[in-house]
Amino acid sequence: MLAKLNERRSTLNGESGFTLIELLVVLIIICVLLAIAVPSYLGFRQKAQERAAQANVRTEIPSAEAYMESSATSNYAGMNLAAITAIDAGSKLTVVKVGTAGDDYCLQSTVGGHDARYIGPAGSAGSLGAPDLSGPVLGVCP
């Protein structure tokens, strides 16, 4: 039994585990990797939210055109968020504005604090400003 205790004591006096320097080096490496990864992740998340807002607006452009085709006045007068939702129950728009003459409209969606808008139709500029010819852009309705 005494031999077993002496054997155990000799193994405990030997090197085992990591030194403080080795642990600090590993900790510094992990911190550097996190410093690189976290900003990249946040940038990807921001771009995804911006693109989601643009996709929401792009999806609802046909609903706005359908409203105009079905209206008795053949323009966008009276179009609002409720009218778009009646056409497309899955609408994710947050703002719908119509120009003073009813000849143009602005659709807006907000995802994670990022706004996207579309001013249409793609004709001449109305009271809301120049149309967004390339599709939804970042920003809010005027």
Predicted segments — roles?
Residues 62-142:
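Periplasmic/extracellular, small/polar-rich flexible segments of pilin-like filament-forming proteins
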Residues 15, 47-51, 55, 93-96, ...:
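Residues at secondary-structure transition points
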Residues 1-18:
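N-terminal leader/signal peptides at the extreme start of proteins
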Residues 11, 42-58, 71:
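Aliphatic-rich helix starts adjacent to a transmembrane/signal segment
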Residues 13-41:
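N-terminal single-pass transmembrane signal-anchor helix
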